[in-house]
Amino acid sequence: MKQTLIIGTRASKLALVQTYMVRDALQSAHPGLTVAVEHITTRGDIILDRPLNAIGDKGLFVVEIEEAMRAGRIDLAVHSAKDLPSVLPPDMTLAACPRRADPRDALVAQPGMTLAALPSGARVGTSSLRRACQLRALRPDLTLVDLRGNVDTRLRKLREGQYDAIVLAAAGLKRLGLDGAISELIEPDVLIPAVGQGVIGVEARADDEEVLRLLAPLDDQAARIAITAERAFLARIGGGCQVPVGALAHLEGDELLLRGMIGARDGRMVRGMQRGSASDPVGLGCALADELLDQGGRALLAG
């Protein structure tokens, strides 16, 4: 049995907080196990002067970490699941999905400010085509401005007055202890979140049976079922950073409820919701994707 595991992660404050959560869970599940952390710089960390969708759409924050796993430098990787491509390389697997945090988007602005109350022309920062598309549909009078950098950098730019408001993932703010910065939690029926938002995705080599066994206790069934449906939806559409796509699933007893959206950059979009058996999340994800593609999503993707 392995006595030491090495986790690979990006070096941002949020990535490290999430990695330490996984490290602590591993050591709690396996007393005596030593877990080390290696920082890895990805292409998405280096290129900060262009919007994400202008760089490329496959694994911007993932590829270099996977290469370190293949080389044997690390045993597993911790990601924000929303950064993972919809289909992993055949030699990699999503080995564990710990319990999901708040999947909603959060408005960060003056205390008490809401999305509905933002004044016309307000400058709203976001790096996400998904958020921008839905915001344009909801509030075409807002001025949307690209926003890059880690959470601290984004908050600093807001304080400096470069933006009137910014939209970030609530889970990241909460994990960093920045709940107080949130002026409004935006419900999923207003802004459908990114696929996997709020989930920590633990990736490992598909053939590393010992690491997979060690990670098994960290997997949360509800998170696994939900993200499987969401990722099936995304894979069916073929979406990445260059396509405004969102999906959120949650369990209601034995049923799984899945919301999804496909959009265009100008704010046109199709949205929908389906229920299905929790025993077939892939089928539900594909069914909703097919429905939205047939209802106009295919034309939106074609431009």
From Swiss-Prot:
The keyword Ribonucleoprotein does not apply. Pfam families: Porphobil_deam (PF01379), Porphobil_deamC (PF03900). The modification S-(dipyrrolylmethanemethyl)cysteine is found at C241. One of its GO terms (cellular component) is cytoplasm. It catalyses: 4 porphobilinogen + H2O = hydroxymethylbilane + 4 NH4(+). Disulfide bonds: none annotated. InterPro entries: HemC, Porphobilin_deaminase_cofac_BS, Porphobilin_deaminase_N, Porphobilinogen_deaminase_C, Porphobilinogen_deaminase_C_sf. GO terms for biological process: chlorophyll biosynthetic process; protoporphyrinogen IX biosynthetic process. One of its GO terms (molecular function) is hydroxymethylbilane synthase activity. Its EC number is 2.5.1.61. Keywords: Chlorophyll biosynthesis, Porphyrin biosynthesis, Transferase. Binds 1 dipyrromethane group covalently. Monomer. Belongs to the HMBS family. The porphobilinogen subunits are added to the dipyrromethane group. This is Porphobilinogen deaminase.
